[in-house]
């Protein structure tokens, strides 16, 4: 009996050992994390597809899907095809929470990607307990500096330079270029605008006139007119506008109507010509001469290898749509997401993806003209901007005819001219 039991035990142990060896050689099982099968990865995004903030931003999911489809047609990511589920949050935080819950609980996505807006992203991150549940929130479309704080947001990764970084770079430019001028600022009075104010303060710039506005109020006819009345009364020779594109539209249109001239310096969020054109095409020429900031190559730059690739992919996927900054943003976001998924390997898990971005993200191939700042201690995305001037078509052209990039951090670090050289694009723009 003892010998028989020993033989059975030995046989059982051998079978278990073989089974373990076999299991270790197989791809990740579909049940390891929600949103994964052996052949698919399901991602989700909430974004304003309708509502006041939808013009321009509503193109981001389509741009992301265009790049994902291109990758899928070329073999996918480690044998898996990517699907993207998009939800309309109307730029309303409570709606963003509801839509994020749908993505997580009903659609069972593996990760969120590219959620848009500071207030919406903060709300959905807290309410759905992304951090506690270990759900990655990849490359959020907001520059609020808090999302780069790993301790506060351990599963969230920024992709845009922070608003504090942008404000510090803007401040350096304004102080050096418009010394002695009367300078005013219009800013959105929420975490978006206040993050910028912290950057301006860090850079040591003060404004003669501060004009805050509540998010959404820029669409009211009296709001823009009120801004211009205050600017005229202050004698502002230079006006910084740190708001969304609909705020830029209101400011530029009312300044034109009142025949008020000031040198406009527009933050990156508020300077998209296509978004302004969605309100009224006649407003686009009003951008002429304004200063703008970007960290990606201009969408009109046909000499850039990423722009050429993205234009080709988008023309096939969305032949009736205009290729613009929003498309570049969406496709760039998708590109970096694919790099991260590829680097995480075939045995993909949520925890493994987060660790991969922390360990390797700073070296990911990407379209941006600034370094990425991902590390084991910080979830910082791009780290700088180049400065340009809008022409009569609304295109932002680099000053001096070349991209001169300035980088900084969200603290008290200096603003410096960058010597960063972007790595060559992978073959065919596919993950490597």
Task: State what each model feature region is.
Residues 94-98, 145-146, 154-259, 300-308:
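Extracellular/periplasmic Venus flytrap/periplasmic-binding protein
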Residues 255-331, 423-430:
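Extracellular/periplasmic periplasmic-binding protein-like sensory domains
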Residues 1-42, 420-432:
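Short, low-complexity disordered leader/linker segments with a strong preference
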Residues 362-432:
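Solvent-exposed, acidic/polar segments of extracytosolic/periplasmic ligand-binding ectodomains
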Residues 33-65, 87-94, 116-117, 186-194, ...:
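Extracytoplasmic "Venus flytrap"
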Residues 197-199, 245-250, 298-360:
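Extracellular/periplasmic ligand-binding modules, especially the Venus flytrap/periplasmic-binding
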Residues 31-32, 55-62, 74-150, 159, ...:
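Beta-alpha junction/loop-to-helix N-cap segments that form part of ligand/metal-binding clefts
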Residues 103-117, 135-140, 182-187, 235-245, ...:
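Periplasmic-binding protein-like
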